[in-house]
Amino acid sequence: MTYEEVTAMAAETGLPYAYDHFAEGESPEPPFLVFLYPRSDNFVADGKVYRKINELHFELYTDAKQPEVEEQVEAVLDSHGIVYDKTEVWIPEEKLYEVLYSMEVLNDGNEQEE
């Protein structure tokens, strides 16, 4: 899944979104979505990367528990056949809930042909 495909998937949620963070002073009112690739878990053999696999995070921020917004994000992930794990935390300093969707995606743009 390319960066452009992930961006399109974020747009499908209908929420404001950004990669990693919004610029200083440009953060929208919640709910909003941030996505990023915190690490990779590539398939390697014989000193060669055969499959590039990125960990992808979709971070949903809300100022109150909003199950309907979570369902909106999950519907998009489900429609793309994405398998994800979900965690939630309250961030007291920000007065926001973060619902984290963690998943692994193949980096199709860099797959090597066999």
Specify the residue positions occupied by each region the protein language model found.
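Long, contiguous binding/interaction regions
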Residues: 1-57, 61-114
